[in-house]
Amino acid sequence: MNIRQQITQFLSLAYVFSSAFMLWKTLSVIANSHSPIVVVLSGSMEPAFQRGDILFLWNRDQQQKVGDIVVYEIDGKTIPIVHRVLREHHNQQKQLLLTKGDNNAVDDLSLYAKKQQYLNQKADLVGTVKGYLPFIGYVTILISENVYFKYGMLGLLGLSSLFSNE
């Protein structure tokens, strides 16, 4: 393989990654959310959503109501949580929410930060669920939880780049 083919392959790969990044950033701006697409990682929302479902979020100046399914993040925790709004209150121009997983026995108070009794709609919410695709996100769960699957996928990608003729 000559240098021109190597440069072409590198540029093609860079094009794929930059296109994916631009698509992600465009979705982020449109949905007004730093993470417009999330994968359900647990069974706390069954039967509404199963583990591995991909959720599409929207966060454009809307008030949540009881029954809405929201995704939120807590300070100090890296994994977003998908749960349903159980109660909502208004306090000094801000909306406060209490959430609970459909498959959980109790509300999410124990998941919130210390001394936090409600979620702040503006500060804690990533978005409201507007749509989903079932089970497609299971690949990301397999990659994060199974080391052999992760290295197998990396190996296949490496082999495919070595043996491609273009």
Curated annotation (Swiss-Prot):
SUPFAM superfamilies named in the record: LexA/Signal peptidase
Localization (cell): Endoplasmic reticulum membrane
Cellular component terms (Gene Ontology): signal peptidase complex
Lumenal membrane side: 31-166
Membrane topology: Single-pass type II membrane protein
Spans traversing the lipid bilayer: 10-30
CDD domains xrefs: S26_SPase_I
Keyword tRNA processing: no
EC code: 3.4.21.89
Molecular function terms, GO-annotated: serine-type endopeptidase activity
Cytoplasmic face of the membrane: 1-9
Keywords (A to Z) from UniProt: Endoplasmic reticulum, Hydrolase, Membrane, Protease, Signal-anchor, Transmembrane, Transmembrane helix
Reaction(s) catalysed (UniProt annotation): Cleavage of hydrophobic, N-terminal signal or leader sequences from secreted and periplasmic proteins
Pfam families linked: Peptidase_S24
Active site: S44 (charge relay system), H83 (charge relay system), D108 (charge relay system)
Family label: Belongs to the peptidase S26B family.
Quaternary structure, from the entry: Component of the signal peptidase complex (SPC) composed of a catalytic subunit SEC11 and three accessory subunits SPC1, SPC2 and SPC3. The complex induces a local thinning of the ER membrane which is used to measure the length of the signal peptide (SP) h-region of protein substrates. This ensures the selectivity of the complex towards h-regions shorter than 18-20 amino acids. SPC associates with the translocon complex.
Domain comment as written in the entry: The C-terminal short (CTS) helix is essential for catalytic activity. It may be accommodated as a transmembrane helix in the thinned membrane environment of the complex, similarly to the signal peptide in the complex substrates.
Protein's recorded name: Signal peptidase complex catalytic subunit SEC11
Species for this entry: Candida dubliniensis (strain CD36 / ATCC MYA-646 / CBS 7987 / NCPF 3949 / NRRL Y-17841) (Yeast)
High-level lineage: Eukaryota, Fungi, Dikarya, Ascomycota, Saccharomycotina
Gene giving rise to this polypeptide: SEC11
